[in-house]
């Protein structure tokens, strides 16, 4: 039976990171970083310093990808864990990656001072998935990094099989690290005879044998209640806030905008940490799935720098129509800040249309090179996830990271 395998080496190379300066909240320093080379999807970013603008050989423009390293940690993290890590060859903490986002997993491993665990993942000719752990996990605290992004069902099934493999190999604890949780939007019924797929997926992960879930910026907080196991909800706002602070935008010019009524709580929390900026709300009504209609604006944005905050960008209809309304109401500039870059067609065409000054996302799921465009900025959440994993492993407080 034919198969396609993915095997991680016993000691993956440490990635090279780049950032121009250390940033702190609302400092006068500026962060401007360009990458000059990218490896394939199954490797980490390779970055070199560019003192002058240098074109990338990509179709849609030059993405700006600041990646945090030990010199440029945001203020909420004190230092990298390299010097604090346990013996690499004799540890009860194991970190494995699925095939969905191995670049992020490698960055997390670098921050933690660990090597990624060796695992062989295959796709058989009929589409079945095969997983074999190539090192012992007996009695270990195992963390599996696997966002359930596109192809959603395939990546979800791979995660379930990885969890099962760890459980059958006598791992002491298995934590599913899910930077992007697919099906999170199916968290309630909006019409009769619909399923609540988020609850179903939570049940599948639990029944597969996971002891804990670590997820980033869930679509709704109540999704945590669908699990019968502990869930650590990681908020990626500090990474985005730290980057915005490096742009030195005067606080009196800022206004935080929620693209819909449902995101008001998220935008309010963001505004409070962004110099307690004023809040505006875009009132929209949906006529169907992935279709948004902007109706009205609540709040004043005239002459302001508008920061639109949401958990994800899918087809970008909400963000782009909201940006058009903000410009119509007199906003000077519009930024979009979202954790998850889903980027389903026709998102790239919409986002690169000129309405947005900058589109700021994170690397919770991989962004294909074909989807790069000049306004795109990708921030790494590897340090945030790495620190969270360490604290869970050490039985320390996780919530204190975000206070």
Curated annotation (Swiss-Prot):
SMART domains: Pribosyltran_N. The keyword Transferase applies. It comes from the Eukaryota. Pfam families: Pribosyl_synth, Pribosyltran_N. Coiled coil: none annotated. It comes from Arabidopsis thaliana (Mouse-ear cress). It is found in: Plastid, Chloroplast. Residues 1-49 form a transit peptide. Belongs to the ribose-phosphate pyrophosphokinase family. Mg(2+) binds at residues 217, 219, 228, 232. It catalyses: D-ribose 5-phosphate + ATP = 5-phospho-alpha-D-ribose 1-diphosphate + AMP + H(+). Its main location: plastid. Its EC number is 2.7.6.1. Binds 1 Mg(2+) ion per subunit. Keywords: ATP-binding, Chloroplast, Kinase, Magnesium, Metal-binding, Nucleotide biosynthesis, Nucleotide-binding, Plastid, Transferase, Transit peptide. InterPro entries: PRib_PP_synth_CS, Pribosyltran_N, PRibTrfase_dom, PRTase-like, Rib-P_diPkinase, Rib-P_diPkinase_bac. Its cofactor is Mg(2+). GO terms for molecular function: ATP binding; kinase activity; magnesium ion binding; ribose phosphate diphosphokinase activity. One of its GO terms (biological process) is nucleotide biosynthetic process. GO terms for cellular component: chloroplast. This is Ribose-phosphate pyrophosphokinase 1, chloroplastic. Residues 303-318 are annotated as: Binding of phosphoribosylpyrophosphate.
């Amino acid at each position: 039976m034919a198969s396609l395998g993915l095997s991680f080496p016993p000691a993956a190379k440490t990635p090279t990171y780049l950032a121009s300066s250390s940033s702190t909240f609302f400092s006068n320093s500026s962060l401007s970083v360009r990458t000059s080379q990218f490896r394939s999807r199954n490797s980490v970013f390779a970055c070199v310093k560019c003192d002058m603008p240098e074109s990338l050989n990509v179709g849609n423009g030059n993405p700006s990808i600041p990646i945090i390293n030990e010199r440029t940690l945001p203020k909420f993290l004190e230092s990298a864990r390299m010097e604090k890590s346990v013996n690499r060859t004799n540890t009860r903490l194991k970190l494995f990656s699925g095939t969905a986002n191995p670049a992020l997993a490698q960055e997390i491993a670098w921050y933690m001072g660990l090597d990624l665990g060796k695992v062989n993942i295959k796709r058989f000719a009929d589409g079945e998935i095969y997983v074999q752990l190539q090192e012992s996990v007996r009695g270990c605290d195992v963390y599996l990094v696997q966002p359930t992004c596109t192809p959603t069902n395939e990546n979800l099934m791979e995660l379930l099989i990885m969890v099962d493999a760890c459980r059958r190999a006598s791992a002491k604890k298995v934590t599913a690290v899910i930077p992007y949780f697919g099906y999170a939007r199916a968290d309630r019924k909006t019409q009769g005879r619909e399923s609540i797929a988020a609850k179903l997926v939570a049940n599948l992960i639990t029944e597969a044998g996971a002891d804990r879930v670590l997820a980033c910026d869930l679509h709704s907080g109540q999704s945590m209640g669908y699990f019968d196991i502990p869930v650590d909800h990681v908020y990626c706002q500090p990474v985005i806030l730290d980057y915005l602070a490096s742009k030195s935008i005067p606080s009196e010019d800022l206004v935080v905008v929620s693209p819909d009524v449902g995101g008001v709580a998220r935008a309010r929390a963001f505004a409070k940490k962004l110099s307690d900026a004023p809040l505006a709300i875009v009132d929209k009504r949906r006529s169907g799935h992935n279709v948004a209609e902007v109706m009205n604006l609540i709040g004043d944005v005239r002459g302001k720098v508008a920061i639109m905050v949401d958990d994800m960008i899918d087809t970008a209809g909400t963000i782009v129509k909201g940006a058009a309304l903000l410009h119509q109401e007199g906003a000077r500039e519009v930024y979009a800040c979202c954790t998850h870059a889903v980027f389903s067609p026709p998102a790239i065409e919409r986002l690169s249309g000129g309405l947005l000054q900058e589109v700021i996302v994170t690397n919770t799921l991989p962004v294909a090179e074909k989807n790069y465009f000049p306004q795109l900025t990708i921030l790494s959440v590897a340090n945030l996830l790495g620190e969270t994993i360490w604290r869970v492993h050490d039985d320390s407080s996780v919530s204190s990271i975000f206070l």
